């Protein structure tokens, strides 16, 4: 491709409304342009990258044995009513009425459509397992679209759905998809983690997120320093090790009129925060226990996902208000604790190992110091209640935990029978009777992968693509003052044609521009391999090679340039 014939569309300045690096660089590199809130045109440079990511996803999915289909973006409301998600999904589901006064939606996902399709096409257990996928545009009417294509309203997604007659069969396909996703993100050259995840509202028995590590990520990712253990912070197990020490002091009731928070208590009484506990009151799951106390160490944070899964706690999790707490306990939020507590309590594992700790006395303006389990208060139920912190021991016993920010680019679920049951999707089983199909679903945000890659791989000059396979162009030819030097022009043209003949994805900057402008544009869009052709070097039979990723520069003989690139490209 010649730049003189190409829509490069680069910008020198960063648009004011672009908050994250990927949005800034995608606009500056001429990859996307906004059309409306959360809607973007993909320009040639952006589309080249998007299509290359899409092709990698497609190739690996096909290798896994999945079969590609394509389903409509527009879906009839009847399917959503049948699955009972018509009312549940909320305002993100864009609904409209056609000229025949029939309700439709723009598909944010395709569980309903694929379940209906397979129900109609598959009648026997002999036709299963089946794994169907598509790469297609989705639409979710986000209340606050932001960060460019990272969280837009329209996006490109690969969604796959598998159908089975047994949980064992589902697990086999799930394992295949887990490996396939690892292959995809490894091939993309990304630093990522496959993490155990909460199944959330989708439900199911197992779930993994694939997270690209980046400082701008919205999720906290926990992983071991010495093993493959990784989990979303919502699911990461907090291990407590060691033994509870014997009491060393007598429990004491202390006036603390100005200590409304843990920080107040620590500062005013010169306490160690690790020797304090905080008590949080939530709604109970049973009428006979309307309130439950959850107790964590003063320097730890309650993990609400873990708390919500406790059988004693109401789902969804709801914190009690000040009036409810005062009515039941007789003290305000800043003065609560396990001693003489009139409601059931559940304590975190780390709290169970504490001795001589400080806690609210359930009397406003008072705290107990030097409290000990079994001596001053009975040990309540113990559970994993907290978020892990950096340096905690890994649950698998190998190394310590690290925490980094991540961008979710893929998610796989074992759905079970949630949709097939609701939509009566059955096949004839081996025994001749109808059997409800068991489902799995597997998604990759293809357009989000592009943004996540840029978030992870960039510098002050622009984008550094993590893999040659997804760069908009693999090689750039940058001729210095080509229109003033016949030798430069002739060699540049010959090299360009040779690379085209070898099917190398090459961009030839044949513009009448200053070298500084040419370098800035090529480095901004992230072309990994640059061949710089200058008059002085050519006179010596040489050209200059520059690597965008490493910054390496090398002078090579012009006769060797094709062999040199053959060894470097996609290496």
UniProtKB/Swiss-Prot annotation:
It catalyses: tRNA(Pro) + L-proline + ATP = L-prolyl-tRNA(Pro) + AMP + diphosphate. It comes from the Bacteria. Its main location: cytoplasm. Keywords: Aminoacyl-tRNA synthetase, ATP-binding, Cytoplasm, Ligase, Nucleotide-binding, Protein biosynthesis. It is an enzyme of class 6 (ligase). It is found in: Cytoplasm. InterPro entries: aa-tRNA-synt_IIb (IPR002314), aa-tRNA-synth_II (IPR006195), aa-tRNA-synth_II/BPL/LPL (IPR045864), Anticodon-bd (IPR004154), Anticodon-bd_dom_sf (IPR036621), Pro-tRNA-ligase_IIa (IPR002316), Pro-tRNA-synth_IIa_bac-type (IPR004500), Pro-tRNA-Synthase_IIa_type1 (IPR023717). GO terms for molecular function: aminoacyl-tRNA deacylase activity; ATP binding; proline-tRNA ligase activity. GO terms for biological process: prolyl-tRNA aminoacylation. Pfam families: HGTP_anticodon, tRNA-synt_2b, tRNA_edit. Its EC number is 6.1.1.15. One of its GO terms (cellular component) is cytosol. NCBIfam families: PRK09194.1, proS_fam_II. Homodimer. Consists of three domains: the N-terminal catalytic domain, the editing domain and the C-terminal anticodon-binding domain. Catalyzes the attachment of proline to tRNA(Pro) in a two-step reaction: proline is first activated by ATP to form Pro-AMP and then transferred to the acceptor end of tRNA(Pro). As ProRS can inadvertently accommodate and process non-cognate amino acids such as alanine and cysteine, to avoid such errors it has two additional distinct editing activities against alanine. One activity is designated as 'pretransfer' editing and involves the tRNA(Pro)-independent hydrolysis of activated Ala-AMP. Belongs to the class-II aminoacyl-tRNA synthetase family. ProS type 1 subfamily. This is Proline--tRNA ligase. It comes from Histophilus somni (strain 2336) (Haemophilus somnus). The lineage of its organism: Bacteria, Pseudomonadati, Pseudomonadota, Gammaproteobacteria, Pasteurellales. The gene is proS.
